Amino acid sequence: MQRIMLRAKLHRVTVTQADLNYEGSCGIDQDLLDAADMKEFEKIELYNVNNGERFSTYIIKGERGSGEISLNGAAARRAHLGDQLIICTYAPMTDEEIATYKPKVILVNEKNGIKEIKKV
């Protein structure tokens, strides 16, 4: 049996851009993607801390070092500039994998720069 488990989380990143007319997706600073081992076009779940919205989309690469968290297309309706989001990826795992696995949690500063990388 497999269970769907948290793989990585960007905790309380701040929305820096929103473009309703873009085709869709969430742009994320490449530094954050590398730290969390998230990949372009990977499905993500987003949780808006400010309004409680929960939605999913996919990743596109943002400029390295920019602090970018951009919501595009329909996702742009789910948050305002300055809102804080929790962005998660999940993966199927067996009980044997779960026994030794620890997800990555990336904590950021007010400019979406990496403050701490934890395995929880």
UniProtKB/Swiss-Prot annotation:
The keyword RNA-binding does not apply. Its cofactor is pyruvate. One of its GO terms (cellular component) is cytosol. Pathway: Cofactor biosynthesis; (R)-pantothenate biosynthesis; beta-alanine from L-aspartate: step 1/1. The active site is at S25, Y58. Keywords: Autocatalytic cleavage, Cytoplasm, Decarboxylase, Lyase, Pantothenate biosynthesis, Pyruvate, Schiff base, Zymogen. Heterooctamer of four alpha and four beta subunits. NCBIfam families: panD. This is Aspartate 1-decarboxylase.
